[in-house]
A protein has these predicted regions:
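A short acidic, leucine-rich amphipathic alpha-helix
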Residues: 26-31
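Short amphipathic alpha-helical interaction segments
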Residues: 33-47
C-alpha cells in the first residue's frame, strides 16, 4: 500500500508540472489529484504568487510557475532530498 503524499509533495508536483505552463486538466492528471484538491491547491498557489493564471484566448487558460514559485520548488526539492535521506537511514 502506498503512503499518502504530504502537502509539500503535492505542491512540489504541481510546481514541476506548471514550470512550462499547463492547463487544469494536465495538472490534475499529472499530479494524480481530484478536481477539488486541484482547486484548493491552485487557489492557494495563485493567491500566494507562486503560480500565474494566463488567459491565452477563449476559453484557453494556462497556469505557469512564477519566479517566486521556482524558488519555492528548489526549496521543496532540497527539503525532500534531506528527508528522503534521513528516512532511508533507519
Amino acid at each position: 500500500m502506498q503512503r499518502r503524499r504530504s502537502n509539500i509533495e503535492i505542491i512540489g508536483d504541481m510546481l514541476r508540472i506548471g514550470a512550462n505552463g499547463a492547463g487544469k486538466t494536465e495538472i490534475m492528471y499529472s499530479a494524480n489529484m481530484s478536481y477539488s484538491q486541484l482547486q484548493k491547491y491552485l487557489s492557494m498557489l495563485i493567491s500566494q504568487g507562486f503560480i500565474d493564471r494566463l488567459e491565452l484566448g477563449n476559453p484557453m487558460v494556462t497556469y505557469r510557475v512564477t519566479e517566486r514559485g521556482s524558488t519555492l520548488l528548489r526549496s521543496i526539492d532540497t527539503i525532500l532530498d534531506v528527508l528522503e535521506f534521513k528516512s532511508n537511514s533507519f
